[in-house]
Amino acid sequence: MRTLTRGPVAAAVLAITLAGCSFTPSIVQRAMDDDPDQLLAQAAQQQGAEAAQTRLRAADILARSGRRPQALEVLNSLDDSQLSGDSRRQWALLLSELGDSEGDPQAVVRAASVLDEMQLPNDEANLLRLRQGLALGQLGEPLESARLLMQVQSATGREDINDAIWDQLSALNGRQLEALEEPGNAIVTGWLELTRLVNQSGGDIQRLFARLDDWRVANPDHPANRRLPTQITQLRELRGKSVQSIAVLLPESGPLSGVADAIEKGIRSHQANVVNGGGNGAQLSFFDASNGNLDELYQQAQSSGAQVVIGPLDKSDVTRLESRAEVPLPTLALNYGQSASNQTKNLYEYGLSAEDEARQAARRGWQDGHRSASMLVPDNDWGQRVGEAFWNTWSELGGDIATAVRYNPGASATDSTRRAISNPRPDMLFLLALPDFARQVPPTLEYYSASDLPVYATSHLYEGTPQSRLDRDLDGVQFPDIPWNIPDAAVGGAEALPFYDTYQELKAENKPAIFRLMAMGVDAYELARRMPQIQALPGSRMQGATGTLSAAGDGRIYRELPWAQFSSGVPAPVFSDGLGDAAP
């Protein structure tokens, strides 16, 4: 989950808060000599509405006296259903303010629930919607966040939330952008056109700004025309810095040569389609990395005139690069090194990591309101690595592990599944399994009267092509996968996929396992083309064949994957509500 940059956003919230001072209720004018601790003790002896009103008064005094964390705790524990209309309005405004300032987005979302239940003055309603939109962005729900922020802008015309709106829109895929369309709303339409324009420009900055000029002519009164998002204006500085030459370091022999061949095919096919489509296609030079002599490979890359390097692929080679202070050329390695984090200057790391999927499963389960998880992973090195990734992320979020079961991949799933759901009964199951084993798990859950237990898996249970008869037993199981593998669930159909021409060419003739690696090659080429943008604008996103890609602070490329849920044996769309219903 990516947290919003708080600079301009905080300023926007502050401005609206100050503008709303005229409607601040009388609780902020109460006598300053009231003792909040005595009020809380008094509330403990009271019941119902009287206790809720006393706690609200105490929380207000705590907040104004600088004891904001305690004030937030009091408001979170308060039964707001016991408050009268005006007091409940005051509770919502104060809780949302404290939740925003104290880093508790769930509290903000709870406060904003009053918008569905009571009529508020416009200024107050817009303030709550703004805070709710920002909170949902922090909770990893860019679709609803963008919807609310654009609603606020449509009502107020504010331009100082443009960066917040752009931050959320740039995280959305084609299907999600379509879901935001509001015919007749010029602000929403303009934002969606701008987002698609940037997404379709690739790494060609000149092409982007030529199209941007056309957009500005067509949208003269749009808030983003008057004040372009900061990330877009910063791209102006990259004009004339496009990548013209890329060196690719892949092994031509050895155990990774088959993987390298698939990645190379993806790179070459996409480069040809970019050129054929009139884009700025960088020249490619391929060098055999089988011998692992990294210094020699960099010398060859520099001699070829390369501006960016793709590779190496071998994990040990990437780990060796991580031991250096700097690499000679900006480098997109095709694996992750073994260091806890990458600190090498100019080194970026990208791959299709099962550990990443496990972390996303943990975050999604938490966002969906689950707090106790069981794990069912294979008893091998792969299961240990991926299982640890889920366990660590789940624990960091505050979740409990009810049971962790390591199973024999060659055995029946019956006993291991039974043990995974035995006492204490979890409220979700994390499953790491290949298709044959995974298909046994839901029927076993049904046998043990646990068919309603949510199951979150990784993409490894899906073979990559719809097989309704074989996969019907997986109905209800949720899993993330690359957009190119689940086009209907990811973007509403193959035609809306990123790099559709390349997708058509590669999908027609290749097995699913090879197809994933080719998709990785496509995104590697696109990331290399955009290297100046990645370096200049940390956190900028790309809608790719393998997910929504962005570079973390340590140069590792983070993939946010779309989710699918088996329905009648085929992957179907599924959306997280992002709000949950459990206590933090």
Report residues per predicted region.
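Extracellular/periplasmic periplasmic-binding protein-like sensory domains
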Residues: 426, 442-520
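Alpha-helical protein-protein interaction scaffolds
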Residues: 33-232
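Short beta-strand elements at the ligand-binding edges of bilobed clamshell
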Residues: 339-363, 471-483
